[in-house]
Each structure stands twice: as structure tokens, then as C-alpha cells.
Amino acid sequence: MAKKTRRVVKRKKKLTVDRGVVHIKSTYNNTIITLTDPDGKVITWGSGGTAGFQGTRKGTPYAAQLAADQVAKEAVKLGMKKVDILVKGPGSGREAAIRTFQAAGLEIGVIKDVTPIPFNGCRPKKKRV
């Protein structure tokens, strides 16, 4: 009879980070919020879809507020006190998400707009009439 081998189970160690970076990508259709440590490793994330919205409602400021609230609660639970915020995109959920992080009791260090702007790159699509 074959001898049974024991499996070694690795336990996930409790993560404590005092400072983090919040990346808010706000498009017209959705808002995606990612919380990383200063090195860029993802800790948690949320979006309009994970907050329970479907279709065009994912792009609303309220959906961004709920998604940011989920991420902020997770950050506070991990013991995070200070965050820097990087905002990308033209969507309507930008300000709502930033206000939610302030209301959650997190100290905001820097709010920076990192929306990519072309230096006369690709030709844009023709104008819709």
C-alpha cells in the first residue's frame, strides 16, 4: 500500500501596511479602484461591478462611491492610515471616490492626475454627427 504524503499548508500572513497608493481609473462606463502598497503590489480592488451595479449604472458617481467605500473599509481594516491618490480618466466617478476616502478617515497625502495625454499621437476618430 502506498504511503500517504502530508501536504504542507501555507498560511497567508496578516498584512499590515501603514501607507498605500489608491489608483482610481474612471471611464465613462465604469470606475475601477485599486489599492496598492508603495511598491505597487495590489492589496485589494473594487469597481462599479463589484459594488453590485450592471450596465450603464456602473459609470455613475454613486457606483464609484460604493466601490471606494469597499476599498477604504479594507484599507482601514489592514491598519492603513495615509494614502496617496492617483486619478486616471475622464469619468464621473473621480470626485465621488476621492470624497469617500476622505470620509472613511484616511489621511490623503497627494492627489495626482495621471490621465495619459498624447503628444500628437494617433489620429483621433472622425467626429460623430
UniProtKB/Swiss-Prot annotation:
This is Small ribosomal subunit protein uS11. It holds the Pfam family Ribosomal_S11. It comes from Thermosipho africanus (strain TCF52B). InterPro entries: Ribosomal_uS11, Ribosomal_uS11_bac-type, Ribosomal_uS11_CS, Ribosomal_uS11_sf. One of its GO terms (biological process) is translation. Keywords: Ribonucleoprotein, Ribosomal protein, RNA-binding, rRNA-binding. GO terms for cellular component: ribonucleoprotein complex; ribosome. The keyword Secreted does not apply. Part of the 30S ribosomal subunit. Interacts with proteins S7 and S18. Binds to IF-3. Located on the platform of the 30S subunit, it bridges several disparate RNA helices of the 16S rRNA. Forms part of the Shine-Dalgarno cleft in the 70S ribosome. NCBIfam families: PRK05309.1, uS11_bact. One of its GO terms (molecular function) is structural constituent of ribosome. Belongs to the universal ribosomal protein uS11 family.
